[in-house]
């Protein structure tokens, strides 16, 4: 079954009926042009994708990019600080864009100033640094910086600047602000002009809650005060999230500072924002540093500096990103042409979010328990109180929260793009999830940091799931998401008993599967497998082994004998290495071990034209590229259907290679390019420009996790281009258990059966063992295989790559989904290994048929 073509859950409610039942006059779409036509013409790249992270970044239409590119090709734009003709064109165009921005927000240059910044965060920092704070002193209490706890991290971060100025920072809870009306703090001393700043979002980026724009005037006038402090209140209205889908009228709501981010509105350019400053406030702003273009006059040898009279020029240090500013013109043009304006966008996106909220909140398990818990301060009754955001967590039928990272992984199988975590808004996250300050600190001590996938600690969620709509979102997007939730989560795992694999079942693998036979191209040449090959610069290997080994029973015979013998024994049944990261496996029966793991395992990787590592997540056809290692000839042969084989030397001439830097799982690695010939070969097969690079033999990448036993403190463990650890081990009894689950699912409409060989290949392990019980490997603390000793680092947390059939490159979400359900929503399978210690003074090998001796955690030999 192809990914995304999953069995359909209950059909979402009829959209038209919802529109008719709504108390709001809802509109879907933009007049005569259908949404499907808009998507086809302007967002064709979204075909097959459900993009629901518009609060993170919306998408740009094709016409906007085309017109911007055409503009750049037809005009010459120079530095606006110069005085030539091209510079004059740039200056005038930039000023026209400033005016366009003010018009968009229903105001004029007489009331507001547009200061371009590197984004809304830079705009907030500018306010924090330029605001006329008054420090605390014995004579007065000083200024107050108050911010709603439901604010973006970048707003909360302003308190560090305030603290440096000896200014008191006070977080204000939303409920306290709602009840603050009538606290006339200013009336007690009307002559006090002590400046205070209150910051709040027009729309919560966490839940989509929209706070009253009327607060702007109420706080400024003193009718609603965040705290009881005499003085003059200024208001910063964080509009970055709000203005992406709604009109903002600054003639009616005259906040003092309004930071915005343009990619939230147009999709591009990124890295450009603005601070809109009320002209009445501008003279109060202070500036320390001055950069190019901001000075009317200054002396290099004397402390003499006169700022420019224009407030915008005074605060725009250096040359602004003028081409990005010019791109805004085409953003405004496209938005107006495609939608008719922000009022239409607000109606369209609210219709979608209200419909989705209604359908999502009504989903129930058979026992009546809700499928989701929605975090909101509104009933989604009106766009005045709710934006196009839904924040939630998925529950099981017992009411327990399913971790957001698991939901994210499942969504990716259906090509649904959403956001998880706390969304840079910890205040709202704590409030809605019931997380105390002590809990957050405890979670950090347990290893959880912002942006990771640690979703449940001590049974409590560390974050949630967020979907958000943009102006190009469609009804089909909403319904695809609802079907995904229904399909995946209305089949409760408690309704699906998990059978346990028996010892006899595990021993029957040889008759049910051909997984013990090395595939074509495996290391079968005795001169290779038995170690008869030249030395390499990775490890010192002797040229031959004892000839007596050739007269002994073969590894395959050993494996078969043990499988049919002692049911409690553990043996190695298969060994795989993956010379090229994310490409096909190379199966061997005996293979040398080096300091990084199996020799040449994941020593190469394919990168795109930007030098970014490619994986099967982005390019499933990588699994069809088959590498073969020939240690005698010191070459790697790469094959693929329809392509002539190509050879790559195992080691390049160090004097001829140029070292470049790449990244693997956030680690910096030194690599070198394997040449244009193999680049052309890979590019032709994959249909995109790419290169093959190899880890430099002179660079050591150290593992973040180190063995706890067997090595002195400070010892580092070397890694190749692997993600986590040197080895991955999988137990065939565990695979058999999963196969049974999948076969049981066949009775409920699954369209595909899974062989043991297929399942083994999906998990891309190095070592396959035969064990007595499913998942017993997760109880191991360390193991010995022959003379080699390993520490078990923990389970492998699986991603959507296990959905890819390694023989065809086709996706199927059943494996991931079944594994998630059968293991209590966990997606762990296999365990990571690392050498406890390794003596390379003599050759070391892993062999099929070797006995595995596990030691249980806090116990003894298994």
From Swiss-Prot:
One Pfam family from the record: MOSC_N
| Recorded catalytic activity of this chain's protein | Mo-molybdopterin + L-cysteine + AH2 = thio-Mo-molybdopterin + L-alanine + A + H2O
The modified positions for N6-(pyridoxal phosphate)lysine read 264
Top class in the EC scheme: transferase
Which keywords, in A-to-Z order, does the entry hold? Molybdenum cofactor biosynthesis, Phosphoprotein, Pyridoxal phosphate, Transferase
Q: Please give the biological process terms from Gene Ontology that the record holds.
A: Mo-molybdopterin cofactor biosynthetic process; molybdopterin cofactor biosynthetic process; molybdopterin cofactor metabolic process
Q: What PROSITE patterns would the database entry show? A: MOSC
> In what residue span(s) does the MOSC domain sit?
704-855
> What pathway does the annotation place this protein in?
Cofactor biosynthesis; molybdopterin biosynthesis
Q: Which residues carry this modification: Phosphoserine?
A: 34, 517
Task: Give cofactor(s), names only.
Answer: pyridoxal 5'-phosphate
Catalytic residue positions: 424
Record function comment: Sulfurates the molybdenum cofactor. Sulfation of molybdenum is essential for xanthine dehydrogenase (XDH) and aldehyde oxidase (ADO) enzymes in which molybdenum cofactor is liganded by 1 oxygen and 1 sulfur atom in active form.
Record's family?
A: Belongs to the class-V pyridoxal-phosphate-dependent aminotransferase family. MOCOS subfamily.
Q: What is this protein called?
A: Molybdenum cofactor sulfurase
The source organism is Mus musculus
């Amino acid at each position: 079954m192809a990914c995304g073509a999953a069995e359909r859950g209950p059909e979402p409610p009829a959209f038209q009926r919802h529109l008719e039942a709504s108390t709001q006059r809802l509109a879907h779409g933009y007049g005569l042009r259908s949404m499907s036509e808009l998507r086809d013409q302007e967002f064709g790249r979204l075909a097959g994708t459900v993009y629901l992270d518009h609060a993170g970044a919306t998408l740009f239409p094709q016409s906007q990019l085309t017109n911007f590119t055409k503009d750049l090709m037809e005009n010459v734009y120079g530095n606006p600080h110069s005085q030539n003709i091209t510079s004059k064109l740039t200056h005038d165009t930039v000023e026209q864009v400033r005016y366009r921005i003010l018009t968009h927000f229903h105001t004029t240059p007489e009331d507001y100033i547009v200061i371009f910044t590197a984004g809304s965060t830079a705009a907030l920092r500018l306010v924090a640094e330029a605001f006329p704070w008054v420090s605390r002193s014995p004579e007065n209490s000083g200024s107050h910086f108050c911010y709603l706890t439901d604010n973006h991290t970048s707003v909360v971060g302003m308190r560090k600047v305030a603290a440096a100025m000896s200014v008191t920072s006070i977080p204000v809870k939303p409920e306290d602000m709602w009840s603050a009306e009538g606290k006339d703090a200013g009336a007690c001393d009307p002559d006090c002009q002590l400046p205070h700043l209150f910051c709040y979002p027009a729309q919560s980026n966490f839940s989509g809650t929209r706070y009253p724009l009327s607060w702007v005037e109420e706080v400024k006038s003193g009718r609603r005060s965040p705290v009881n402090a005499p003085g003059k209140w200024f208001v910063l209205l964080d509009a970055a999230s709000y203005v992406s889908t709604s009109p903002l009228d600054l003639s009616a709501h005259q906040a003092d500072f309004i930071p915005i981010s343009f990619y939230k509105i147009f999709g591009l350019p990124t890295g450009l924002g603005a601070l809109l400053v009320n002209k009445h406030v501008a003279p109060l702003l202070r500036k320390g540093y001055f950069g190019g273009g901001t000075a009317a006059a200054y002396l290099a040898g004397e402390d003499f500096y006169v700022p420019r009279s224009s407030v915008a020029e005074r605060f725009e240090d250096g040359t602004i990103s003028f081409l990005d500013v010019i791109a805004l013109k085409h953003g405004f043009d496209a938005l107006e042409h495609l939608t008719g304006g922000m009022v239409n966008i607000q109606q369209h996106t609210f219709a979608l979010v209200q419909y989705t909220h209604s359908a999502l909140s009504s989903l129930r398990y058979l026992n009546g328990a809700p499928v989701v818990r929605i975090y909101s301060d509104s009933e989604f009754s009106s766009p005045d109180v709710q934006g196009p955001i839904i924040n939630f967590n998925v529950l099981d039928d017992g009411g327990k929260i399913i971790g957001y990272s698991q939901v994210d992984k499942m969504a990716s199988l259906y090509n649904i793009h959403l956001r998880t975590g706390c969304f840079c808004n910890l205040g709202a996250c704590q409030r809605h999830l019931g997380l105390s300050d002590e809990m957050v600190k405890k979670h950090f001590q347990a290893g959880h940091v912002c942006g990771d996938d640690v979703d449940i600690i001590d049974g409590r969620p560390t974050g949630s799931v967020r979907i958000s709509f943009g102006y190009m979102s469609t009804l089909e997007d909403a319904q695809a998401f609802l079907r995904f939730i229904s399909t995946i989560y209305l089949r409760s795992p408690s309704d699906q008993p998990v059978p346990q694999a028996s010892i006899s079942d595990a021993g029957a693998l040889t008759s049910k599967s051909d997984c013990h036979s090395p595939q074509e191209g495996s290391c079968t040449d005795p001169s290779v497998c038995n170690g008869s090959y030249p030395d390499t610069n990775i490890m010192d290997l002797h040229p031959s082994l004892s000839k007596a080994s050739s007269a002994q029973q073969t590894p395959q015979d050993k494996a078969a004998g043990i499988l049919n013998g002692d049911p409690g024994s553990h043996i190695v049944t298969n060994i795989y290495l993956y010379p090229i990261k994310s490409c096909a496996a190379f199966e061997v029966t005996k293979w040398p071990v080096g300091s990084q793991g199996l020799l040449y395992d994941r020593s190469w990787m394919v990168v795109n034209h930007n030098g970014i590592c490619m994986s099967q997540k982005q390019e499933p056809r990588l699994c069809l590229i088959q590498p073969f290692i020939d240690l005698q000839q010191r070459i790697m042969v790469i094959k693929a259907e329809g392509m002539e084989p190509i050879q790559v030397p195992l080691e390049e001439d160090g004097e001829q290679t140029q070292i470049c830097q790449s990244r693997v799982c956030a680690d910096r690695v030194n690599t070198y390019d394997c040449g244009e010939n193999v680049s052309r070969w890979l590019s032709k097969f994959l249909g995109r420009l790419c290169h093959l690079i190899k880890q430099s033999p002179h660079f050591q990448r150290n593992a973040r996790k180190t063995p706890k036993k067997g090595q002195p403190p400070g010892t580092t463990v070397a890694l190749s281009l692997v993600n986590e650890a040197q080895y991955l081990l999988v137990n065939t009894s565990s695979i058999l258990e999963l196969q049974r689950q999948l076969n049981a699912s066949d009775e409920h409409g699954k369209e595909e059966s899974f062989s043991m060989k297929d399942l083994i290949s999906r998990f891309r392990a190095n070592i396959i063992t035969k064990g007595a019980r499913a998942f017993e490997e997760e109880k191991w603390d360390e193991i010995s295989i022959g003379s080699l000793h390993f520490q078990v680092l923990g389970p492998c947390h699986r991603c959507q790559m296990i959905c890819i059939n390694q023989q065809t490159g086709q996706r199927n979400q059943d494996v991931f989904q079944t594994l998630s359900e059968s293991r209590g929503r966990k997606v762990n399978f296999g365990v990571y290994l690392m050498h406890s210690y390794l003596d390379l003074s003599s050759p070391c090998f892993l062999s099929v048929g070797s006995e595995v001796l596990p030691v249980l955690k806090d116990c003894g030999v298994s």
